[in-house]
């Protein structure tokens, strides 16, 4: 999905976010995004581990 976005596209997105939210909100947005990604990775790992355990259990 995002594979076609190059460096100029990322710069454009960052400028748009800066204009929309302002420089004071960026740290809050970054923190929230980081926490969301961390939780997503944790959930994905848990699901993968569960699936692997089920697979091993059914052998």
Swiss-Prot record:
Keywords: Cell membrane, Membrane, Protein transport, Translocation, Transmembrane, Transmembrane helix, Transport. One of its GO terms (molecular function) is protein transmembrane transporter activity. It is a single-pass membrane protein. The chain crosses the membrane at residues 1-21. It is found in: Cell membrane. Belongs to the TatA/E family. Part of the twin-arginine translocation (Tat) system that transports large folded proteins containing a characteristic twin-arginine motif in their signal peptide across membranes. TatA could form the protein-conducting channel of the Tat system. Forms a complex with TatC. This is Sec-independent protein translocase protein TatA.
């Amino acid at each position: 999905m995002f594979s076609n976005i190059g460096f100029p596209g990322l710069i454009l997105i960052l400028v748009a976010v800066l204009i929309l939210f302002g420089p004071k909100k960026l740290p809050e947005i970054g923190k929230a995004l980081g926490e969301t990604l961390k939780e997503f990775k944790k959930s994905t790992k848990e699901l993968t581990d569960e699936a692997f355990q089920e697979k091993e259990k059914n052998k």
